């Protein structure tokens, strides 16, 4: 049974928001106060909302759902791709292409083209082409891979998306809202929580805070797979093995301060 402690969030710097002048008034109910001109997020609320978000992710995956991690900001790029691979899910960590969800058929066409180029590399087709032709195909493939490599094995639209910066990923959020795809997201003091189905108030800039949030989401995916009796594809780990960061943070916060049990 997972635990989510205030201490764990505190040690990750989860409580630091943005400068008070940059806030979104809709976040008022999630703000504890201000210190030196910076909003402090109410971690008593964050820990409960994190638990609720994790439970939703777990239940969705247990029911056979798929998850799309979205994080294109510099601090999140590696975290998002690593967690998606660890859990056998999907990710977008470069620029979000408009229509990735709402124009799925067109995106599928680009993915098919990427797979065609990949196949040509291994079946000997490249050997029959000129150097210029192979270079053109390589460039084309690299461009598509950079944009869509994290979803090239996603056969259908995801059942939920997990977002680490709702301002930067506003197009992804809007597309998900339009299609009725639930959104789980980390929302900082300058964000609008209203379009988010499961908002988790917290710092969306600090590496430790991002690591904690993304790792908790990934652990919930794995828990859902465990409960469904499914193996975790392409992860290289056994079901139930949590991330190193999540394990260390959990140990640091265990038994201290208030905790919420799932």
UniProtKB/Swiss-Prot annotation:
One of its GO terms (biological process) is translation. It comes from the Bacteria. One of its GO terms (molecular function) is structural constituent of ribosome. Keywords: Ribonucleoprotein, Ribosomal protein. One of its GO terms (cellular component) is cytosolic small ribosomal subunit. Residues 234-262 are annotated as: Disordered. Belongs to the universal ribosomal protein uS2 family. This is Small ribosomal subunit protein uS2. It comes from Magnetococcus marinus (strain ATCC BAA-1437 / JCM 17883 / MC-1). The lineage of its organism: Bacteria, Pseudomonadati, Pseudomonadota, Alphaproteobacteria, Magnetococcales.
